[in-house]
């Protein structure tokens, strides 16, 4: 007669142990939820920062490229001017 | 003679029945308590599962954000390298420009000197 009572009490004790473990787990998950939320926010901020970094570097590249093109055009114009300055006297001498 | 034997078995049965009834009642209450605790345990497990799923989605989103940030930073670094290359070319072309301008000035000065000498 005492064995079924022990089984019920044993099962009750096991359920109590599991309940305590579940409560501890729920508490940890609540803490983790706050940490995960902060982590998501920080990763979102990092992503936005990376996007801005990408935009800025792209603008810098375009700026440098435009400067490069301008210098190229200026050099071409100056070289043409140099050639003109050299060729005109020669042509004048021949005529 | 027949009355006395009938009385004794009734007393014995009553005592045994009371004990068994008390035992069954206690066991029933314990079983109900056990079922109630298991029900609460199920509720806690459901809550835990919901939180795990939610945090899993948040972690996946965070991982995607980090991956995207990594790719964009790498792309940005490549852009910076290209910008540095263009800047270096610009410096070289500035030097070339200065040299060409000096050549033009030399030619113009030479022509001026010749012109003055002719006078």
Swiss-Prot record, chain A:
Cytoplasmic compartment segments: 1-70
Record-annotated membrane-spanning stretches: 71-91
PANTHER family documented for this protein: SYNAPTOBREVIN FAMILY MEMBER (PTHR45701)
tRNA processing as UniProt keyword: no
Source taxon at top rank: Eukaryota
Domain named v-SNARE coiled-coil homology: residues: 7-67
Keyword Coiled coil: yes
Function according to Swiss-Prot or TrEMBL: Involved in the targeting and/or fusion of transport vesicles to their target membrane.
GO CC field: plasma membrane; SNARE complex; transport vesicle membrane
Keyword terms of this UniProt record: Coiled coil, Cytoplasmic vesicle, Membrane, Transmembrane, Transmembrane helix
Protein name: Synaptobrevin-A
Stated induction or repression of this protein's expression: Regulated by the srfA transcription factor.
Topological relation to the membrane, as annotated: Single-pass type IV membrane protein
Vesicular compartment spans: 92-95
One GO-annotated biological process of the protein: vesicle fusion
Gene coding for it: sybA
Gene3D superfamilies listed in its UniProt record: 1.20.5.110
Subcellular locations according to the entry: Cytoplasmic vesicle, Secretory vesicle membrane
Family per similarity comment: Belongs to the synaptobrevin family.
Single Gene Ontology MF annotation: syntaxin binding
């Amino acid at each position: 007669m005492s064995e079924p009572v022990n089984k019920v009490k044993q099962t009750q004790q096991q359920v109590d142990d599991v309940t305590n473990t579940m409560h501890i787990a729920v508490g940890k998950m609540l803490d983790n939820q706050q940490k995960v939320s902060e982590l998501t926010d920080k990763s979102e901020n990092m992503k936005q920062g990376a996007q801005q970094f990408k935009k800025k570097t792209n603008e810098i590249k375009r700026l440098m490229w435009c400067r490069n093109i301008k210098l190229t055009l200026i050099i071409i114009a100056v070289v043409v001017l140099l050639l003109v300055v050299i060729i005109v006297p020669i042509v004048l001498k021949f005529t | 003679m027949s009355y006395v034997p009938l009385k004794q078995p009734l007393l014995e049965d009553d005592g045994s029945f009371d004990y068994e009834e008390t035992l069954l009642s206690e066991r029933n209450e314990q079983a109900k308590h056990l079922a109630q605790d298991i029900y609460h345990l199920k509720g806690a497990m459901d809550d835990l599962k919901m939180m795990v799923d939610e945090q899993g989605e948040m972690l996946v989103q965070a991982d995607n954000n980090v991956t995207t940030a990594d790719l964009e930073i790498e792309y940005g670094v490549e852009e910076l390298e290209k910008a540095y290359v263009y800047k270096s070319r610009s410096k070289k072309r500035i030097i070339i420009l200065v040299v060409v301008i000096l050549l033009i000035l030399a030619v113009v000065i030479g022509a001026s000197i010749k012109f003055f000498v002719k006078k």
